[in-house]
Amino acid sequence: DKYGADACRFGIMIASPAGNDLLWDESSNEQGRNFNNKLWNALKLVKMWEGRQADSNEPVADSFATLWFEHRLNEAKLELDNMFKEFRLSEALKTIYSLIWDDFCSWYLEWVKPGFEQPIDKAVYDKTVFFFEELMQLLHPYMPFVTEEIYHQLKERTAGDDITIKQSAAATATDASILANGALLKEVISSLREVRLKNQLKPKDTIQLHIETATTEAYQSFETILAKQINATHVHFVSSAVTGTISAVVQKDKFYLQSELELDTSSQKETLLKDLEYQKGFLASVDKKLSNERFVQNAKPEVVELERRKKADAEARIKAIEESLATL
């Protein structure tokens, strides 16, 4: 009565790892109730776009978002197929939970959400409803009541079109490059938001973003989404450092945030120095491992190659950080 049937089912299953005793705690039911609320809030957001679709003959700026989530959904389906075959039901629920809460609600819906009182592209809206339906099918065995209700509220159904008897679509092949670009976009957004916060730039303060990268194609594929998420009026691709800006390093790429406001570089310098210290320590640990002849001779070739890639990435990042520090 306190949490509801779906939340209790969720709480029991999320705390039931295969082969182990049940480590149930009432907080698991609270997590299930919060998940219920998250689903309803996502439904409310999507229903707000109902009747506000607009057909567009132009390339849709949010097309990367739908493409990425389609591949992310299929990637999760392939993982879930293996988990169900091995009866790893609790692990499967955790995968579905993360897919819905993190990838769909926290990222995808934010990427496709139109501006205030703006219409959403009809193709994007239809894809979003389809994704929501697919997610409810995946979650249905664990939380049957809320998923069935949301499934029917997403759009009108014919008699007998019930999620409980509907066959789920099989997973299709995924594209690793699209998934990698999605992961890159998430990392860049998170990093640049943190940079804005540390430099006391308010969410409403606009910036211009300059990107120094060897892989412009990846950024061009999601340029519009990135600009919207960090409130950038323009995105420029440059081949050298831009002075008078806030700089940041993500992976091997450098970002320069240009603002009309007066900038304090002290916090920016402190962040870069901390990152530089960490990267140098990480590089030293990798070097130590690679200088051990017993490790190189006895470890699997792919393990040694992975360590060498780690070394190359760390060296590239150290170089990028040092170049950013030089511009301050």
Regions from the language model: what does each represent?
Residues 1-20:
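Alpha-helical recognition segments enriched in aromatics with Gly/Pro capping
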Residues 2, 23-328:
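Feature 926 captures the class I aminoacyl-tRNA synthetase adenylation module centered on the KMSKS loop
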